[in-house]
């Protein structure tokens, strides 16, 4: 059975001599404990010779800040001699795509169920309550700005 270890901000699992690194970001909510929420998937990847690094986070409306924090966490544990692949699920895809290096620090990205919905669509209760309270709330960057940032890379 693979052994998970916490190294700095990252949870890691993998062989002692990996063929590469998979940097994983989970979806909103599930990303708080990726070593538990995505255990079967990530351990299967590690059994195939990859060192899996997961950054855990609590969701916020500032997705750009989360993307920078995740990127810094991965960068602090970088294995310079190994190829890097980025794997994201849902909001984790968005965070990888918003990384400050614009993907230049990896050989490829696998993005599962990319979520770029607005705040009121992602959080239905917010969509119901915000108009009644006379407030408007949106992620930063919002959906249109996210697509503009991604396509300009």
Placement of each model-derived feature along the sequence:
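Short, surface-exposed "cap/lid" segments of acyl-processing enzymes
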Residues: 3-60
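Active-site-proximal flexible loops/turns
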Residues: 33-34, 63, 97, 120
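Serine-dependent carboxylesterase/thioesterase catalytic core
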Residues: 69-153
């Amino acid at each position: 059975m693979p052994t998970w270890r916490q190294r700095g901000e990252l949870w890691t699992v993998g062989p002692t001599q990996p063929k590469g690194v998979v940097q994983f970001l989970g979806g909103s909510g599930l990303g708080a404990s990726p070593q538990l929420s995505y255990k079967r998937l990530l351990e299967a990847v590690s059994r195939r010779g990859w060192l899996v690094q997961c950054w855990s986070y609590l969701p916020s409306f500032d997705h750009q800040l989360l993307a920078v924090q995740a990127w810094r966490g991965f960068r602090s544990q970088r294995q310079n001699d190994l190829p890097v692949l980025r794997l994201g699920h849902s909001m984790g895809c968005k965070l990888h795509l918003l990384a400050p290096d614009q993907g230049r620090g990896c050989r490829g990205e696998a993005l599962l169920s990319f979520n770029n919905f607005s705040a009121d669509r992602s959080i239905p209760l917010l969509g119901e309550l915000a108009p009644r309270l006379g407030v408007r709330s949106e992620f930063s960057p919002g959906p249109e700005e996210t697509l503009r940032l991604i396509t300009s890379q």
